[in-house]
């Protein structure tokens, strides 16, 4: 058995030392050959704009089929853009057709992986059957917790996406789901001491430790809408998440050239996750420039 606290944590004051991050989620766009020209253009535009990579990290999340091309280009051209995958399997290996393990992603030098994005976590509609919906939510939370543990074990930093499942959800419902994932994380890790997980007491989850992951708050009502959530709601959610556990928090959903800077520069936020507005290298470079002026 590994000693407790063998899990990936950082000192509680690390937040103040870490740079902010602007990440682009390509979703199911941009093929492997387009990815090469995209990254080359984004890189030279950032350099031409005088971007300070030491103060603001830039990351992209290509489709799985692009990752080898991205890895080769980043290594050969010494590009200072991080990258990650859009999902990961909850299993380490075996008969799981179509799934990609965390170790496979690590072998491709992925730094990050998105976990629990609402577009991955859509639930079927069960009119009037709240118990069925709750049961499915519970299973999803357990699956997500396993994905987190697989990422930790492989040395990849997960970005846990949380948000309302339906437009009628409230602030407390989103936080309840976040707590549920952490609760599953604790339950699983208590049974898998080889991973060395031990959760402390702060709000029944963590004490002064920081899980080596990020949390992206993405309300479903804002995703693909072109409109961000209310700034007050964003800050309130970021504060509530950080009160539960010491993690860095990003915002995603409706981020574009015109609202990105205001959201990015909120004191309690550690960065933004951009979708549609990151699909064109020139436009994404302009968005980054407005945030980092």
Curated annotation (Swiss-Prot):
Active site: 117 (electrophile), 218 (proton acceptor)
Keywords: Cytoplasm, Gluconeogenesis, Glycolysis, Isomerase
Pfam families according to UniProt: TIM
Compartments, as annotated in UniProt: Cytoplasm
Disulphide bonds in the chain: none
Catalytic activity: D-glyceraldehyde 3-phosphate = dihydroxyacetone phosphate
Annotated GO CC locations: cytosol
Enzyme Commission code(s) on record: 5.3.1.1
Pathway assignment: Carbohydrate biosynthesis; gluconeogenesis; Carbohydrate degradation; glycolysis; D-glyceraldehyde 3-phosphate from glycerone phosphate: step 1/1
Gene3D superfamilies: Aldolase class I
Amino acids binding substrate: 25-27
GO biological process, one term: gluconeogenesis
GO molecular function, one term: triose-phosphate isomerase activity
Family under the similarity heading: Belongs to the triosephosphate isomerase family.
Subunit relationships: Homodimer.
Function as written in the Swiss-Prot or TrEMBL entry: Involved in the gluconeogenesis. Catalyzes stereospecifically the conversion of dihydroxyacetone phosphate (DHAP) to D-glyceraldehyde-3-phosphate (G3P).
Record-given protein name: Triosephosphate isomerase
Upper taxonomic lineage: Bacteria, Bacillati, Actinomycetota, Actinomycetes, Micrococcales
This protein's encoding gene: tpiA
